Amino acid sequence: VRNTAKITTAVLAAGALTLGLSACGSDQDAASDTSGPLVVAASPVPHAEILNFVKDNLAEDAGLDLEVKEFTDYVTPNTATEDGSVGANYFQTQPYLDDFNKKNGTHIVSVVDVHLEPLGLYSHKVKKADELKSGATIAIPNDTVNEGRALQLLAAGGLLTLKDGVGTSATPADITENPKKLTFKELEAAQTPRSLDDVDAAVVNGNYAIEADLKPAKDALVLEEAKGNPNSNLLAVKEGQENDPRVKKLAKLLTSPEVKKFIEDKYAGSVLASF
């Protein structure tokens, strides 16, 4: 079962990366110098792609100097935002952010919701979820929120039943019915698509699915629905930086008609605008 130690260990392991960012200037440079560029930490796909669209097509006319730094993990963007190495980040959902703050004592806050990446169940071995054999192994993300989302997805697909009211805090201990006797392999979220040759199926976050050339709208055996989904990806800053004029400009651009059209055209339903 996932616990605080896993994220805490990851924070320590990510320290070298964060220090590398800090070495480029004082801890307050990125967050407090509103005359310089706004440095945003982001996952490569689709977050950095969306930010680079803004940078290349919209930022100059809005008077925004935007710099994008890519990260492939779900820890360093928050630690870098907390220590001021970057001015903002764009990679996570509100439930993940709340859980991260609680477990790590950070002070990151949401600015605006931008898009939803539907979580999906994928397999190289079966074409339909009900074809999974008894005792099948399912890879799921090991961070608290995405693990809960993964189990909720499997429940929505009719593969298991969870205790009432557990929401995204669900763990395998909350399973009340498991007719296929599924077993679970908990992995860092980025590793789940790479596990597809070794497990019967894997629950993969939308951004990592796209990076792995999976098409969520087409390839997923079970896919999260957008309606009523609390897991939109958001632009976040350290508490106190919400009124930075650069952040306000970026928030407006990220929720513009131009960005909505870019998301619709580029991702064809695999990423959905939240505005």
Language-model features: locations:
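Bacterial lipoprotein signal-peptidase II cleavage site
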Residues: 7, 20-35
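Ligand-binding "clamshell"
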Residues: 99-111, 126, 198, 203, ...
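Short helix-initiation/N-cap motifs at beta->coil->alpha
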Residues: 68-79, 167-194
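Sec-dependent bacterial lipoprotein signal peptides
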Residues: 1-22
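A conserved helix-loop-strand patch within extracytoplasmic ligand-binding domains
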Residues: 111-160, 260
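Short, well-ordered beta-strand elements
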Residues: 33-45, 64-70, 137-138
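A bilobed periplasmic-binding-protein/Venus flytrap-type ligand-binding module shared by bacterial periplasmic
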Residues: 118-129, 231-244
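Short, polar/charged alpha-helical segment
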Residues: 45-67, 76, 80
